[in-house]
Amino acid sequence: MSLTRHEIREKAFQALFALNANPDADENQLFQQLLNPEEAGAVEIPAYLSTLVTGVREHQAELDAQIQPYLSQKWSLDRLAKTDLIILRIAFFELQFVDDVPAKVAVNEAIELTKAFSDDRSRKFVSGVLGKVVKNQAN
């Protein structure tokens, strides 16, 4: 099974969402369920899927600290929809730690994830936050 990076990001989002609800879940077993729901045997886990999920989990506190300043003063990470927070964590991780993903691609992919897993308000919110990030990086 060969997945595009877009499809891998979707699987990473699903894995991180599930792990947010159940942090003690077995990552490998979760990957197998996401990649092979028919359970016809184990499939190879794409390296980029492991990179995203493991990286976001290992750097979660750091990513959250980077996201917080981009929220308005009356908002905290706890108030964000979990879908939006996880999408932002993925985008911030790619922006900071993945050298071969241009900022424009990371932002666009995050917006595509909100289209798939959230609503229009979330899409606008995520787009606004990441727009500020890219603008700050350019300065």
Task: Give residue spans per PLM region.
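N-terminal interaction/assembly modules
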Residues: 1-116, 122-123, 127-139
